[in-house]
C-alpha cells in the first residue's frame, strides 16, 4: 500500500490466495478492518477464495461457476442439457458484492511446437514425455488435430463460464483462471495462450472479445438442440459496463446457415444503461422450413460497432426417413452377431455399459474439457478433452459437425463409454475419437468401423437406445450412422479379428 497506494488501478485488495489455518477468519477480518480504517480509497476483502467475512467490502467466492472442484460429472456443463438461460442469482448474496474465484480452469491438449521455445535453463521435459507417449501409441500425426479440437471445446467452456457470470444480475465480476497456461501443478494447460503469452492457433482475441468485453450481447437459449416442429424463441439481453450508457443502440439479430444463407433477422433500438440483465427483445424464428439436419448460427450485434456475439444451434427433423436396408443391431457380440458377420452381413454393435474397465469402461467421459489437470486433482472427472473426427466422414453426413465438440455432441458423449483401441492395428483410426488425457495418451474411440470375417461391423459406445425422444441429438446421431450403414459407402477397409472386439467387452464373447 505504501508503494502502490496511489496507483489509479489499485481498487481492490485481498491479503492473498486461498488461506489455511483455524483462525483465518478472525485474523483476516481484523486485517480488513485495519486497512479500511487506514486507507478507505479501495475495496477490501479477506482473501481470494475464502473465508467470507461480514465486514468485507466484497466476497471472492469459489462457487458461482459452471464447474467447481470436486463436482466432476455433476457440474452444470456436464450434467445439464446445454442451454444459456441459467445464471448464479440463487448462489450469490444480493447484499454483498460477489466476485467469482478462479472460474474456468479448462484444459487443452499440449502444443508440442511449444517445446522449441524453451531455450534457457528451463526445459519442457513434461511436454517431451507427453509427445513420446503419443508417438508410442502411433498417433503422433494427430497431435495438432487434438490441440485444435480440444482448443475449440476449451473456448466453448470459457464462453459458457463467462457468459453465465455476465447474465447474473448484481454480479460483481469474475476472476479467470486463466488466459495462459500454468506449467506447474502437474501441467495445467488451461490457457488459450501458452506460457509465453502467445497464441496456440485455435482462437484469437477478436473472437474471445465477443463474449468477454465491456459490452456483450447475450441470448438466453432454453436449449441448443431443436426440432423442425419447434419455433425458436430466446430473449436477448446485454451486459454493458462501458464508460457511459449507450443511447438508442442499433441492435440487429440474424439467424443464418453455415453457408451464410439468411433465415430471418430483426432489429431493435434500445437504450443500454450501465449494468447487466438488460432485456432488449427476443430472437424469433419458425424452424419448419428446415427439412434436413442443419446447424444454424444466431448473431446479435450493435450496428456500426465491433460489438457482437454468436452461438451455434442445431435443428433436426422430427420425423426421420425409414432406413431401407437396416443392419442387424445388437448389444451383444454373440453367436448370432458373429454368424451374420461370417455370412457377409452388416452389424451395428452398441456397447454402452458393456465396455470392460481395462478397455475404457473406467474412463470418465464428460462433455467438458478436463478441469485443471487430472494429476493435480487426483483423477477428477472428466478424463477426456472432447471429440475429434473428420467432419466430412459419410457416417456423419446427417449429423452436422465441425470435427470437434460443440453442444450437439452433449447428448452423445454424456452417455457413452470410451473404448481403448491400443491393441488394434497401429494405423487404425476410429471415426470419432475421444481425446484422452495427455498423461495416458490412449487411443480412445466412440465410433469405429471394421471388416470382421466376411462382414462389416460398426461399433458405437454411446447410448443410442434409451430415451431418444428426449435426446434429439443422440437420435440424429443414430440416424446418420444407420443411413451410412445402409448405403454402398459403408465399406470398412481395416480388418479386425473377432477376438479383438470381444476383448473390449466386460466378459468377452457373450
Language-model regions, residue ranges each:
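Substrate-binding/catalytic cleft of secreted carbohydrate-active enzymes
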Residues: 1-193
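Short, solvent-exposed loop/turn segments at secondary-structure junctions
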Residues: 20, 51-52, 104-107, 180-182, ...
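Aromatic-rich peripheral "rim/lid" segments of glycoside hydrolase catalytic domains that contact
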Residues: 38, 177-242, 251, 509
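Catalytic beta-strand/loop cores that center a nucleophilic Ser/Cys/Thr
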Residues: 38, 80-81, 353-358, 373-472, ...
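Beta-strand-rich binding/interaction modules
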Residues: 229-271, 280-286, 292-303
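Short, exposed coil/turn segments at beta-strand boundaries within extracellular/luminal domains
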Residues: 303-309
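Low-complexity, Pro/Ser/Thr- and charge-rich linker/hinge segments at domain boundaries
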Residues: 314-332
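Short alpha-beta junction capping motif
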Residues: 326-373, 454-455, 460, 481-484
